[in-house]
């Protein structure tokens, strides 16, 4: 498909200019503040305290059995210091997205959101273990399936058609292959083209476009490196039973070390020993995150 036909197909599928729900302004501001190395717990507490739901959830979690403190905490600054900035980021994103989901599509969209979020977490852990671009890896992992989310919001019938075909195939094809066959574009292509329309840096377009088929070769290039990291994280996410859609999971039940290509692990810079360390950290992180999210739902 040439460039012109690609764009025509894109607009036909998403029904015009690509649009998504917006994160609450406070969450956007908070994410930028957390990314600022000069920001202090007091700065973050000042923003958190302006949102009652966010403040309440931060205090509920820091005082919950999950954290296991002996003494109760009522000071937001102390709570933020104890939980850590990344945990505050996670809570803020969870609240914002949960409030944005509509009731009709809630179950599928929540599954898709959790998969995206967990892929971001795993990408961050992999990149942190390699000492390179952990923050960028989280963002790319979080946004890797933005094409699925955009498609589901803009044209749920097309999203459902590709999903039903994928379910019918029962693991014989991957979801993106089902999309290509039914709607003529994959979610990776939709997400990549949306990034172009939104005038995001080229790195977003390239990593999202290639996250299913990352370029081979050494990972000195940021584009190749992040594509490989997100691909590894996405595969692990499915393997750990956090898929983006409810269907037969072709990756479930397999050992991660046999599922992933040794060449890809080597290219991204992960030895077998370091990969096992990554798996341990991933399991610990996702277990804690799942407990916190479930606690937030049960206590609201």
Where is each model-derived feature located?
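Conserved alpha-helical "signature site"
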Residues: 1-161, 174-258, 295-299
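Terminal helices and disordered tails flanking the catalytic cores of nucleotide-processing hydrolases
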Residues: 1-13, 258-300
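Short glycine/proline- and charge-enriched loop/turn segments
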Residues: 166-176
């Amino acid at each position: 498909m040439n460039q012109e036909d690609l764009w025509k197909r894109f607009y036909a599928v998403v029904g015009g200019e690509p649009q998504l729900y917006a994160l609450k302004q406070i969450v956007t501001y908070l994410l930028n503040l957390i990314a600022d190395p000069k920001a202090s717990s007091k700065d973050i507490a000042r923003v958190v305290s302006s949102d009652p739901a966010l403040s309440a959830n931060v205090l509920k979690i820091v005082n919950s059995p999950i954290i296991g403190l002996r003494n109760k905490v009522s000071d937001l600054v102390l709570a933020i210091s104890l939980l850590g900035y990344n945990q505050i980021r996670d809570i803020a994103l969870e609240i914002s997205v949960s409030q944005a989901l509509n009731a009709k599509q809630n179950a599928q969209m929540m599954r898709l959101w959790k998969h995206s979020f967990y892929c971001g977490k795993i990408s961050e852990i992999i990149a942190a273990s390699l000492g390179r671009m952990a923050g960028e890896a989280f963002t790319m992992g979080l946004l890797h399936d933005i094409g699925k989310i955009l498609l589901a919001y803009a044209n749920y019938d097309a999203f459902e058609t590709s999903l039903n075909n994928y379910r019918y195939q029962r693991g014989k094809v991957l979801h993106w292959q089902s999309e290509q066959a039914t709607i003529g574009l994959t979610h990776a292509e939709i997400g990549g083209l949306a990034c172009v329309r939104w005038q995001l840096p080229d790195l977003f377009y390239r990593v999202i476009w290639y996250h299913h088929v990352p370029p081979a070769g050494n990972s000195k290039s940021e584009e190749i490196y992040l594509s490989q990291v997100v691909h590894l994280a996405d595969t692990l996410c499915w393997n750990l039973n956090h898929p983006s859609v409810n269907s037969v999971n072709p990756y479930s039940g397999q050992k991660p070390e046999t599922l992933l290509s040794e060449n890809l692990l080597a290219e991204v810079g992960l030895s077998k020993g370091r990969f096992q360390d990554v798996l341990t950290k991933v399991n610990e992180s996702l277990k804690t995150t799942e407990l916190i999210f479930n606690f937030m739902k049960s206590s609201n």
